[in-house]
Design a protein with these regions (language model features):
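Small-residue hotspot
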Residues: 25, 315-317
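N-terminal alpha/beta PP-like core and its mobile active-site loop of ThDP/TPP-dependent enzymes
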Residues: 1-227, 237, 265, 269-272
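Active-site diphosphate/adenylate-binding microenvironment
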Residues: 237-315
Length: 317
């Protein structure tokens, strides 16, 4: 039943195989593209005796997940396309957070003054208040965000498969426009590269290492970096205009309360480093659009299959 949604499923039919299966399960879950695994243990296994020495044979505490670097030629090619682009965009997904590559993303964006859009799962990859963050794309993306992504000459996808919700069902010219844009893509999972948009350069590798490689090559091509104060000013105006457009409904005292009012009141009292979980529906999409997240890893949405009931269970752990 669960095999289609896990990386691998095991059934423990021999109690002596239990330690080895658990060891393999944890290794697989954390390797490559992190994901769930299933270890099915029948009830009668827990009442059987086993030799404790079998646990000593596992690799307890020795799990080191290797991070694959980009092919050097791919890193150079991506750097060259970004350095030559007139209107590039970095499109960040949840892979940035899984790779803990937020600092590297910010460093590349700031060096070339490239705007950063994000997916739902990518919220928090760069502070929503960062002067180069242009916000979420897709069904809940803002018009200003899409005005930059649809007119980009180069988009570098980072840890995202350009999924349906983040790409407005792939309708041309709504969120992205393949006729105008050259797509580049980096992902830890090679099966995701070019899955939904054709790519000129696709590279498999860890984003934390890969972004560092690209920045190193970019610095060779543009020793002074780039500054685009006009772009930063446009982004700041767009953010201010959006906040202003929500000001009235966010302060409305009607009953029942508006979702915007709830978000405003919660934002005023919640600590900046509080960890937030959303569920399916407006609370997920509204928070992603209107609730500024400034610290990576402090917001978790049920993206992908959008499992209803994710929020309460995630909070409980």
């Amino acid at each position: 039943l669960l095999e289609p949604v896990v990386k691998r499923a095991w059934r423990v039919d021999d109690v002596e195989a239990f330690p080895d299966i658990l060891d393999k399960a944890f290794r697989l879950a954390e390797s490559g593209r992190p994901g769930p695994v299933l270890v099915d243990v029948p009830m009668d296994m827990f009442s059987r005796e086993m030799d404790e020495d079998l646990w000593a044979r596992t690799h307890k505490g020795n799990l080191v997940t290797m991070r694959p670097a980009l092919d050097p030629a791919a890193a150079k090619a991506i750097a060259k396309r970004l350095a030559r682009a007139k209107n590039p965009v970095l499109h960040a997904g949840g892979g940035i957070l899984l790779s803990q590559a937020s600092e590297e993303l910010a460093a590349l964006a700031e060096y070339l003054d490239i705007p950063v859009s994000r997916t739902l799962a990518g919220q928090g990859c760069l502070s929503d208040l960062h002067p180069l963050m242009i916000g979420q794309t897709g069904f809940w993306g803002l018009e200003f965000t899409h005005s930059l992504t649809t007119n980009a000459d180069v988009i570098l996808g980072l840890g995202t498969r350009f999924g349906e919700a983040d790409s407005s069902s792939w309708y041309q010219g709504v969120t992205f426009d393949p006729d105008k844009t050259t797509f580049l893509q980096i992902d830890i999972d090679p099966m995701e590269i070019g899955r939904n948009y054709p790519v000129e350069i696709g590279a498999m590798g860890d984003l934390k290492i890969g972004l560092g490689q690209i920045l190193e090559e970019v610095k060779k091509l543009c020793p002074e970096g780039r500054n685009n104060p006009e772009l930063r000013a446009r982004i700041a105006r767009a953010k201010a205009d959006f906040k202003q457009s929500n000001a009235a409904i966010s302060s409305d005292s009607r009953f029942p309360m508006t979702p915007q009012r709830i978000l405003k009141d919660v934002k005023e009292v919640i600590p900046e480093d509080a960890v937030i979980f959303t569920d399916v529906g407006w609370n997920k999409n509204g928070v992603a659009q209107e609730f500024d997240i400034t610290i990576p890893g402090t917001i978790h949405h049920s993206s992908g299959l959008a499992t209803m009931g994710f929020g309460p269970s995630a909070v409980l752990g």
